[in-house]
Regions:
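Conserved C-terminal guanine-recognition region of P-loop GTPase G domains, centered on the G4
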Residues: 87-152
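Flexible loop/N-cap segments at domain edges
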Residues: 234-236, 240-252
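Switch II of P-loop NTPase G domains
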Residues: 45-50, 69-91, 102-114
Length: 260
């Protein structure tokens, strides 16, 4: 039958997006999916959950695992975070290592490469934020240093901000897909429920409001979601739970300013 033929031709891959905090992993995931699923903020450690994004086109399905940003393991907590990323990598078919243009390769980058090198999985290297690149020699140094550590399938300079290079990156990822049935239906974007996605977006906005505050004490609870009758609008009521009173003041001030 036609369904059987389609199944026989299907290809898929589970891909872990890994890298240090704030190199743009969530932004790249959102660009690859064509929608906003992962929380994007300029604060370290803002990807709270292991949000999985699913991209399906024709016979190919790519399943992305957006791991928490890698912290250089200066202490036991940092070491735990590195191990958390490594455990995610162990479950995937390929890795996408994201580094930032204009910055030198750190020990944390090297450590991560060594950890998934032992697993023997194919890996791509994406150098993000090339729109901010001022010195091409820094880019060439990054490529040379990381390529000496690992035989990447491809090195792709990209800008998640303006989309430059993202089509080329997607094509390289598609090339990593192996024959095998799809794990998710065609219209699936994430394994996270709708309320979790909405809560993450609200939390992102709250983090942007707290420019000088540490973001670890904020949680968002969705109290109510209801489609507005006859309109393509969703009414949402949410509670933002703050660990510190100073957070409340910042958020209320920002809300009042937005209303004006």
């Amino acid at each position: 039958t036609m369904d059987t033929e389609n199944y026989m031709n299907e290809k898929s891959a589970f891909i872990a997006i890994v890298g240090r905090p704030n190199v743009g992993k969530s932004s790249i995931l959102n660009r690859l999916l064509g929608t906003k699923l992962a929380i994007v903020s300029n604060k370290p450690q803002t990807t709270r959950t292991r949000i999985m994004g699913v991209w399906t086109e024709g016979e190919t399905q790519l399943v992305f695992i957006d791991t928490p940003g890698l912290i250089k393991p200066k202490n036991s907590l940092g070491d735990y975070m590195v191990k958390s990323v490594t455990s995610s990598v162990a479950d995937v078919d390929a890795c996408l290592l994201v580094v930032e243009a204009n910055t030198k390769i750190s020990k944390a980058d090297e450590e991560l490469v060594h950890r998934f090198k032992d697993l023997g999985v194919p890996a791509l290297l994406a150098i993000n934020k090339i729109d901010l690149l001022q010195d091409k020699s820094v880019l060439m140094e990054q490529i040379a240093k990381l390529s000496a550590l690992y035989d990447f399938e491809a090195v792709v300079p990209v800008s998640a901000q303006d989309g430059n290079g993202m089509d080329a990156l997607r094509e390289e990822l598609i090339a990593l897909a192996e024959p095998g049935g799809h794990f998710f239906s065609e219209d699936t974007l994430t394994d996270q429920p709708e309320r979790a996605i909405v809560a993450e977006i609200i939390r992102e906005k709250a983090l942007h409001a707290l420019d000088d505050e540490i973001p670890h004490g904020i949680a968002v609870c969705i109290d109510r979601m209801k489609q507005r009758k006859g309109q393509n609008i969703m009414d949402i009521e949410a509670t933002i739970v703050c660990e510190r009173d100073s957070h409340k003041g910042c958020l209320l001030y920002t809300s009042d300013a937005a209303d004006e």
